């Protein structure tokens, strides 16, 4: 009797079902793919391919008002590059939160996250959605593995139609074309099975001739299952009908005492490793629309009017003539302005040659063009003041700065949306650290004083076994020039007002309670600590003075030998009616000193 082996949970039948499901998902987002590809053409100033032909003229002007909008918004996003900080929800978690706040910037820097942030903001502004991928890459860090934060092209991502949150999709697919030779080197069992896959993803219109005949689509299939009240994330990597990896097929644990991937899933956090950053959200889709979708109609109209105006200028600057067939004029010599003589046959009549008059355009057309340009500026919030320009009559520096700060509220709102997505990315990074960091790692961090410090990060020692609930606070690492200037001026004003004087700490703390600015809590802690140190110092000095003089504390006060009074009793300050210290006149003071010296008895 033959023994029948159990078939793996993920086989050929499951791959065929997944491929059919992927085709349905692709059909559901076909409209989004077309819009993203068209928007990319507008970004590259190739929108004339999407404008109907206007007559037989070959003149096609291209203005970059829409491009300027994207450039300005991207600059605002880079000024607000995020920096994470972990805040504990319980007193016992303060040490762990402080440690993760030091480790996270190192991981972001190792992933060159600033470039990922920049690239995704380009995509967000153009297409309306950018996607971050957070994975565990076993090949990093010399084979020890590390967290990988990558930019994911929305064209290569497929989700369930009708959902608004990627995490709520029943399945999620990521497709990427890979060279056949590379695949065979990594998976020799693919030899003879590659070439011309049954699924093709949407592609951009490249300048270069991109040949994909020797490439095959590698499909990453993510799906969730509910087991025991928790969501488990499973993962399948396949090409065609060949399974390369499947978590449900991994029934053996890699380490002794650990659970197999078939029970544990790919990641312990149970979430899809993709996070969408949407610019302008839409109902029924996790994607959105961008500035190209808002402004491309106005950009078309601007270029059409520019084309007509330039064509009119060219026609007016290039004289054309109505010529009778029997006028006897040598056309070649007449058209050549370098020929001093033009030969004719017979007599010349005025009706034989007449210039075509081109009527100049009215100023109304130029006003319409200017209004369309202003329409793009107003619609996108990219006014002149955002780029350093000022309105007529505004000359005060403070007024200009206030206008620039107020005009940036749209960018600040969009950046806050990106910060929310960034919190999800950081939370996923922390979960991967807990799951996969199994050995100490040496990291270079930034110390409290800005100097380089070196940290030996041991997850088994430094992190708790159970996940800790932390709040992720995101702040801009690079403040704008206006913000830096305002913070510096405020610090100088606080210094001049005596806020940092320990003797005035109680008054300064009272004033801080009514103020709101960045770093207020840190300043409050510093002033409280300085005031406490001063009180302890005064008490210690008083006790020492009593011990040295041998007098009782009350007698020391009466004789004026107070510990913090040097040179005898302290004279009170002379103040005006509102409490300000009166400034003394140097000449008058010298006169008083001479008079006192003369009148003192010898």
Predicted regions and their residues:
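Extended, helix-rich architectural segments
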Residues: 1-256, 260, 268, 313, ...
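C-terminal anchoring/interaction modules
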Residues: 1-54, 124, 132, 138-142, ...
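Well-ordered beta-strand positions
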Residues: 237, 273-274
């Amino acid at each position: 009797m033959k023994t029948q082996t159990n078939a793996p949970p993920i086989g050929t039948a499951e791959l065929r079902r997944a491929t059919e499901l992927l085709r349905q998902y692709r059909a559901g987002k076909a409209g989004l793919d077309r819009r993203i590809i068209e928007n990319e053409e507008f970004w590259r100033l190739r929108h004339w391919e999407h404008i109907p032909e206007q007559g037989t003229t070959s003149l096609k002007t291209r203005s970059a008002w829409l491009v300027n909008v994207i450039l300005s918004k991207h600059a605002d996003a880079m000024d607000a590059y995020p920096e994470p900080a972990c805040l504990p929800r319980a007193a016992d978690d303060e040490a762990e939160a402080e440690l993760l706040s030091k480790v996270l910037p190192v991981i972001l820097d190792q992933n060159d996250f600033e470039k990922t942030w920049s690239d995704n903001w380009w995509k967000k502004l153009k297409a309306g959605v950018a996607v971050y991928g957070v994975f565990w890459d076993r090949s990093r860090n010399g084979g020890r593995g590390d967290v990988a934060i990558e930019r994911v092209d929305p064209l290569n991502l497929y989700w369930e139609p009708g959902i608004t949150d990627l995490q709520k999709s029943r399945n999620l697919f990521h497709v990427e074309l890979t060279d056949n030779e590379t695949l065979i080197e990594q998976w020799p069992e693919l030899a003879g099975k590659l070439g011309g896959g049954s699924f093709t993803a949407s592609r951009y219109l490249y300048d270069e001739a991109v040949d994909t005949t020797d490439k095959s689509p590698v499909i990453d299939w993510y799906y969730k299952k509910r087991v025991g009240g928790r969501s488990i994330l499973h993962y399948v990597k396949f090409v065609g009908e060949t399974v390369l990896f499947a978590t449900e097929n991994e029934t053996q644990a890699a380490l002794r005492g650990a659970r197999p991937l078939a029970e544990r899933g790919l990641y312990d956090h149970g979430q899809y490793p993709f996070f969408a950053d949407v610019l302008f959200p839409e109902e029924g889709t996790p994607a959105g629309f961008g500035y190209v979708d808002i402004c491309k109609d106005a950009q078309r109209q601007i270029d059409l009017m520019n084309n007509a105006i330039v064509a009119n200028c060219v026609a007016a600057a290039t004289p054309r003539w109505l010529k009778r067939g029997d006028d006897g004029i040598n056309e070649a010599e007449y058209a050549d302005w370098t020929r001093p003589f033009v030969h004719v046959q017979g007599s010349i009549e005025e009706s034989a040659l007449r210039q075509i008059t081109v009527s100049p355009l009215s100023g109304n057309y130029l006003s319409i063009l200017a209004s369309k340009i202003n329409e793009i500026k107003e619609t996108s919030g990219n006014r002149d003041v955002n780029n350093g320009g000022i309105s007529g009559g505004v000359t005060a520096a403070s007024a200009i700065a206030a206008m620039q700060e107020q005009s940036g509220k749209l960018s600040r709102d969009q950046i806050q949306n990106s910060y929310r997505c960034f919190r999800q990315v950081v939370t996923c990074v922390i979960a991967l650290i807990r799951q996969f960091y199994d050995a100490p790692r040496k990291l270079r961090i930034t110390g409290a004083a800005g100097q380089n410090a070196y940290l030996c990060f041991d997850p088994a020692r430094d992190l708790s076994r159970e996940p800790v609930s932390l709040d992720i606070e995101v702040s801009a690492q690079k403040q704008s020039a206006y913000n830096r200037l305002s913070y510096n001026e405020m610090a100088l004003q606080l210094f001049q007002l005596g806020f940092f004087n320990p003797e005035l700490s109680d008054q300064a703390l009272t004033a801080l309670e009514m103020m709101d600015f960045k770093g207020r809590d840190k300043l409050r802690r510093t002033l409280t600590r300085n005031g406490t140190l001063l009180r302890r110092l005064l008490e210690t000095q008083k006790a020492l003075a009593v011990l040295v003089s041998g007098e009782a504390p009350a007698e020391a006060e009466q004789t004026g030998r107070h510990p913090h009074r040097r040179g005898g009793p302290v004279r009170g300050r002379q103040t005006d009616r509102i409490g300000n210290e009166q400034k003394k006149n140097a000449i008058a003071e010298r006169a008083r000193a001479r008079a006192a010296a003369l009148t003192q008895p010898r």
